Every structure is written in C-alpha cells, then in structure tokens.
Amino acid sequence: MGGPYVGKERVNENQRWNDRDMSEKFDTSRLPRELSSVFEELVARDPYQLEFHQAVYEVLMTLTPLVTRKPEYQDLAIFERITEPERQVMFRVPWSDDQGQIHVNRGFRVQFNSALGPYKGGLRFHPSVNLSIIKFLGFEQIFKNSLTGLPMGGAKGGANFNPKGKSDAEIMRFCQSFMTELQRHIGPDTDVPAGDIGVGGREIGYLFGQYRRLRNSFDAGVLTGKGLTWGGSFARTEATGYGLVYFAEEMLRAHGTSFDGKRVVVSGSGNVAIYATEKAQELGATVVAVSDSSGFVVDEAGIDVELLKDVKERRRGRISDYANQRSSARFSAEGSIWEVPCDVALPCATQNELP
C-alpha cells in the first residue's frame, strides 16, 4: 500500500502534490463514473490532503459492486455525505515548559460520522499530525467501529505535539491545555476519545483529570483507556495488540497453519506492539525484531517482553536501551525493520508502514 512516508522521512505534502498529478497517484478510471466524480470533487475541495485521499480512494474501490446494486445511494448522495466530516475542530494549544518558555501547538478533533452512535476514536500526539492524517484515520474509524456491531460513530483527534523528551510535568500541562478546549466538543453521549500514538494511560489520566475539573462531574464514559482506579476496563491495555494477533491467527488457520514456530517481526514498541509481541510468543512464535523512531532491534533469541515493558513503559527509554541490556540483541539506526527476514510481519507503529 503506497503512502506518505518513505522510510522515516516525512515528505512535504505540497511538494508531493506538485511532483505528479492526481491521475498518477490514484487511477480514477478503475472507479465507476459515479464514484469517480465523488473522488475528483473531494480532491478539488481539499487538494493537499493526500493521506485522506488515499483512505477514501481505497474505500471507494471496494464499493464498486454496491453502486450497481443500490443506485438509490447515488440519488441520496450517500458517498458524498460519508466522505465529508460532520465537524472539524482545530484549536490552539499553548503550554509552558519547565523553564517557563511558552510553546504553541495545534490541536484537532475530526468528528466524522455519528450515524450509528457517539463519535469514537483515538487521540494522537506526534509531530507529524496534521488535518489530512486525522481525517485519514477518522474516516477509517467509521468502518472499523461499524464492524464491531456496537453503537459507535467514527472520529479521530490529536495534536502536533511531541511527548518524547518531555517531563511528566510538561506533558501534564500540555494535556490540561489541550483538554481545556477539547472538553467543549466531547461527552459520554457525544464523542468518546481514547489513546493512540503518544497518548497512553498517563496522558489519558491527565486529560480526564482536567475534564473532570472543568465540568465538575465524574463522567467516567467520556474517555476510554483510563486506569482501573478511575473507571477503566480490564484488558483495555492489551486489547489492540492481542486483537491483532487473534485476527492474524485466524488468517493463518485459514491457510492451514498457525503462529507456532513462526518467525515474526513487529514494528513499534508502544502499547500495541508490546502486547502483540506478548501474545504472538504465547502462541508459539518467536518475535525477533521491534522498533521505535530511533531505529530497530533484532534479537534472535526472541524479544524479552518483560525487559521491553521495563524499557518502554516504566523507564520510557529508547529501543537501543533494550539492546544495551540484552546480549543476544543488536540495535540498528539505519535501514528498515522490514528488511529483517520473517514469516509474519505485524505493523504496529503508524499508518502506511509497509513498503
């Protein structure tokens, strides 16, 4: 799947758009005329949102049979409606560092679709975050949530804030400033954010504390991913990583095999990657590589999950710290984790990872 990332280097969106025209990026001739016009109008409306274009194009490609079976969807402009968010919120997030210097970041919440229930989707804190990426993720969240059978709509949010290298106090102040604006737009029956890249249990706790302070109400349902001591759910931390492996196990079973004895590579080393690694190894696989934004580690003896948790969750270190404490592991800052030979690849870091 092609995407906006080449290795670890983020490409400037305007330059990428100028490099080639739309016909070279997305072959609209493969879409039926009705969907082709929907996509072309979307691109004309938001010409530089390439990540969002990609998500919409891929969904529209799968809807071709539906167009012929349900012509009334065209009459009701269903495809136009589903590709336009119900609401897009962008806001300023000022915060002070430990030296008293003021910084300003940009916050986002795209409430894409609430046809099935309250908006639901994570918050991402990462310097690459922009409106296109949030719309990309929010659009896909509509369909992911609908497949659960639960009454949930689709949304996504976040900020172009980099939590790496920040103290706990700095992250707390940022989260408090972020929630001071976000709280106007969310609620248990309106929009229920969760965590994502850069937003774990610590950040959710800071966000929930500020929401509770401003609203003077203990609305436990306003955020998911909270700690068990203030209304969180058992196994919430493990759920995404475990779920990935359970799905992959079913895919392997359909091909007459299983994780047992497989050599596995897992990108990332955050919440999803750690628990995907744990579950894959419980099912008999050997996970030989994990990564973070600084590089990747290869451990032919199999990733030591407890050491990985200690490095990344408790000490919030770099993946190189794992290699420094594990004689069987080697760290590389060059190349790609996808160059490591494996039977199964589990992308757990960000969107559009696979080359």
Predicted segments with their positions:
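Acidic, Ala/Val/Gly-enriched low-complexity intrinsically disordered segments
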Residues: 6-13, 19-21
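N-terminal ligand-binding/catalytic initiation module
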Residues: 16-234
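Structural motif
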Residues: 108-109, 158, 190-191, 220, ...
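Transmembrane alpha-helical segments of multi-pass membrane transport proteins and ion-pumping complexes
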Residues: 181, 185, 274, 348-349, ...
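Long hydrophobic segments that form regular secondary structure
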Residues: 334-355
